[in-house]
Amino acid sequence: MMRLWTTLWMCAACLTAVLMPVGTLQAESRPSILLLLADDLSYDAVHALGNQEVRTSNIDSLFAQGTTFTHCYNMGGWNGAICVASRTMLNTGRALWKAPQTKPQLEAEFAGKRFWSQSLKAAGYRTLMTGKWHLQIDPAKVFDEVRHVRQGMPHDSDQYNRPLDGQPDKWSPSDPKFGGYWTGGKHWSEVTADDAIAFLDESVGKTAPFFLYTAFNAPHDPRQSPTEFVAEYPADRVRVPDNFLPDDPHREAMGLIDLRDENLAPHPRTPHAVQVHRSEYYAIITHLDAQIGRILETLDRTGLRQNTVIIFTADHGLAVGQHGLMGKQNQFDHSVRVPFLICGPGITAGRKIDSPIYLQDAMPTTLQLAGAAIPPDVDFQSLLPLLHGEKPTTRQAISGGYIDFQRMATAEGYKLILYPKTKTARLYHLTDDPLEQHDLLESAAVNEENRAMSRRLFRTLLDLQRENGDNLNLTSVYPELAPE
C-alpha cells in the first residue's frame, strides 16, 4: 500500500511540474542565457555556413550542437551606424521605425523597465554585459553589472583608403602601434572573453540563472588580430568574390557617397584591395572564434553548459568587396543577413530552419524560455514555436530599409530592392541567384512574370511598412508597382 501511495505521489508531482505555468518555474529549472554577439559578421563568413576559406571551428561546433536559422535578417538602420539601430531593436524589442532613437526616448524605456535585461532581471536573472553597447543610455543602468564597455568601434584613422595598388601598405593589422583593438595593451576580443569567463567562474554554485550579454566588437574594422591569425590568410590566396564589382552603379542613389565604410578601400575597387580586406576580415573572425572557444571551454569546465541556452548571432553583415561595396548600408544579403544559432537543453542538434526571422527575435524567445513577461509592445516574435516544430503562422516575409534611400522586401525566394531617390527598382531571384548578380528588372531580363512578382513584393512591402511604422511614401514614387 505504501508503495502504491508513493507511486501516486510521484505521478502527481510530475504532472504538476508539466502543467506549471512557465512564469512560476523555479530558478534552478530555468536555463541561463548566454548571448554571443558579433559585429559586422555576415552569414557567408562562417565555415559551417558554407565558407570554405575561413576557419571557425568553435563556432562550427555550436552549429553542430544546436538549431540554425538559415534566413535571419537585420531590419536596417536610420543612419550610417547600422549597429546602433540593430542593437536598439535587440534590447527594446521595437521594430526599426518604432524603436527609441534618442537618449530621452531610451531613458523612458528604462523608466518603464522595458529593456531586455530588465525583463530578465525582474524574472530573477542575474545580468552582466561586456563589450560593445552602442546605445545612447548607460548600460550600467540596465544591467546588474558591466565590464569593459566599448564604444561603437576601435578608432584608427590609418586604415582608410588602402591598399593602393603598386604602393607599399604601411598599415599592419597585427602591430599594436596602430591602436584600435590593441588600445589598452590587450586585444579587445580577448578582454571581452576574459570578462565572460570570469563571470562564469563566479556563477558556479549560485542558484539564480544568469543572462550574460557578450558583445564583441569583432570583426568590425579596424580588422586587427595577432600575427599568427593574419598569417593564416595570405591575401594573394584569398578568393575574390564572384559578385565583385569595381563599383556599384547605384551607389549615389543608395546614399553611400562619402560614407565612412565605403572609404576603407580605394575607388574603384581592385581585386587586390578586396583580397587584402577579406584576408584581414577572415583573420579577425578566426581570432574571434578562438575567444568563443575559450568561453565554451569554461562552460564545460564549470558544468554550467548543461543548463545554458546559447545564442550566437551578429548585429548585421558586411559587403567586404561584394557588389563594389565595403560596408553594410545596403540591402544585399551579405549585409542584411546574419548567422543565427541557438543551442542548449531541449534544443534539437544539427537542425536547420529556413523560415525567415529577425535577429531581434532573440529577445522574446529568451523571455519566453525564462518565464519572463514579454512587454506587450514588443514587435518581434518568439522562436519557440518554430523550435518546437510548429509551422509559422504570421511572418512570411522580411523587410528592410536604410534612412529614406533604400527599402527592401523578400519573400517566396525573391527580393525587391528600391532606391526611391532615383525611382530605381531591382528584383533578384535568390533561389537561383543567391549572390544577387542578375537584376530581373533590367531591360534584357524583364518579363511579365518578373513584373508581377515585383508588384506582389511591393504590396508586401507596403503591408510591412504599416506594421513596422515606416511612413516613407513609396506609392507616389512607384505608381507602376502600386496596387490599383
Provide a role label for each language-model segment.
Residues 466-471:
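C-terminal "closing" transmembrane helix and its immediate cytosolic amphipathic cap
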